[in-house]
Amino acid sequence: MDSVRNFYDTIIKSSHPLVLSLHLAGKAIPVAFYLLGGWFVSYTSHFLIITILLLAVDFYLTKNISGRKLVHLRWWHNATGTNEDGSPFVFESYKQYPDYSGPAVNPIDSKLFWISTYAAPALWALFGVLCVLRLQFISLFLVLFAAGLTGYNAYGFRSCDRWEPNKKSSETSSIWPQMPTFTNVENIQRLFTFQTFFRNG
């Protein structure tokens, strides 16, 4: 009971307690449903669809709402190619506005945001190992999707956090881990048009 009370007190100290609560819930609910949803959903297809929808909601919430509110960062994929600094992303960061006079990033918001953002793909990766050991290949497909989606979000925010907008591209190009690029992938990219939907959020 004390731990619940302490957690509640921590959330209350947040600059955006509602957003922080939604952010943490967005990470926890897909995991909880993956572990317990089989007791309530009898069809595998329904279980997969619901889990994927929960992961998509978490992706959108983190990328377009909680990231902007809690750590003042936002990113989206550059659909036209890579930038001059070698990054495949376009960024918005508090670092772009040195004259900003609003509230600074709350340490509690920042800590819980980054812990949950990095913990999510790590936890899904652990589930993936368990699926391999148990030969649960249908679940493995779902877990790999979850690890990829949450990991992609974590990678985008990590890159945005390390981005220095005031430096020249030649000074920052070395910090970006290069994403693999292939020729003639236009048709493949069309399969992932959900990125365009999220980008405009």
Curated annotation (Swiss-Prot):
The keyword Transmembrane applies. GO terms for biological process: protein secretion; vesicle-mediated transport. Glycans are attached at residues 64, 78. It is found in: Golgi apparatus membrane. The chain crosses the membrane at residues 18-37, 43-61, 112-132, 137-157. Its main location: Golgi. The keyword Membrane applies. One of its GO terms (cellular component) is Golgi membrane. This is Golgi apparatus membrane protein TVP23. The gene is TVP23.
